[in-house]
A protein has these predicted regions:
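One-carbon transfer enzymes
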Residues: 1-262
Length: 262
């Protein structure tokens, strides 16, 4: 089964997730599409401003410094020196396994749909993707599109599930790999994995644990789909909760639950 990966251009945790996936499936993966970190119609600068307002100066500047370091390491070690011993970007991971990289602004465009058809793509894996996948794209992908979401669906649909899981003082988190349909985080679930949340876990702790589980869940999902007729869990909309970008009161609630960003 010919596969294609849609993944966010995030240098922190996603290179490790993609590396684990391609270690198993690089021979049957036709390409990796790297999507902007900006959500929906927001620009990168607007997204950065949203995160600054959410995180505050201290955590935001710490993330920015780490981001710059990761980008410099990727440029020097991976791009200029050509080393793939330590991959600091998702593009470097794809290069390590000899998988083509694309950076289409819109994966629903006729041009990109034709590219997928030319590659014979039958199945798409979305890892922290930032675009909605429209009907034409879904219909031409014979085995479907799956998305990995960092929460125990049907709860915590939408943005920043790790933050909301902590803000609501949950004792358990998880990841769900589900088929994509016309609604956000709505399709039937193929694989769901859980992890324990400890009393003083930080947002960084939970995001790291979530991404480690995500790699396992994605690999398990792909194997089930390739085997044919995977067992599915319901993802009922009437039991769902939806969340968007947190506001100041949500951050105060997050802190009242004795959690920190790092």
């Amino acid at each position: 089964m010919i596969k294609y990966v849609f993944i966010q251009n995030d240098p922190f945790l996603l290179p490790k997730v993609l590396d684990k996936y391609l270690r198993e499936f690089s021979d049957t993966t036709a390409g990796v599409n790297i999507q902007s970190v900006a959500q929906g119609k927001r620009t990168v600068l607007q997204t950065a401003w949203d995160l600054y307002q959410l995180y505050g100066f201290n955590y935001f500047q710490w993330k920015v410094r780490r981001y710059i370091i990761k980008k410099l390491l990727a440029k020097v070690q991976n791009d200029i020196l050509g080393s793939t011993k330590h991959c600091h970007s998702v593009a470097a991971v794809a290069k390590k396994y000899g998988v083509e990289v694309t950076q289409s602004v819109d994966v629903n465009s006729e041009e990109f749909l034709a590219h997928l058809r030319d590659k014979g793509v039958e199945f798409i894996v979305s890892i922290s993707g930032t675009q909605m996948y429209r009907k034409k794209l879904r219909d031409q992908t014979a085995a479907g599109i799956v998305n990995c979401h960092g929460a125990l669906l049907p709860k915590y649909r939408g943005l920043m599930p790790s933050f909301w899981t902590l803000a609501n003082d949950e004792k358990e988190g998880g990841v769900s790999v589900h088929f994509v349909d016309k609604k956000l985080d709505n399709g039937p679930i193929v694989v769901q994995k859980r992890y324990r949340i400890h009393p003083h876990d930080t947002l960084e702790d939970v995001m790291s644990r979530s991404k480690d589980l995500a790699a396992e869940a994605i690999i398990e999902c792909v194997r089930l789909v390739e085997a044919g007729d995977p067992p599915l869990l319901e993802n009922p909309e009437d039991c769902s909760t939806h969340f968007s970008m947190p506001g100041p009161e949500d951050v105060r609630r997050f802190r009242r639950a004795s959690h920190r960003f790092r």
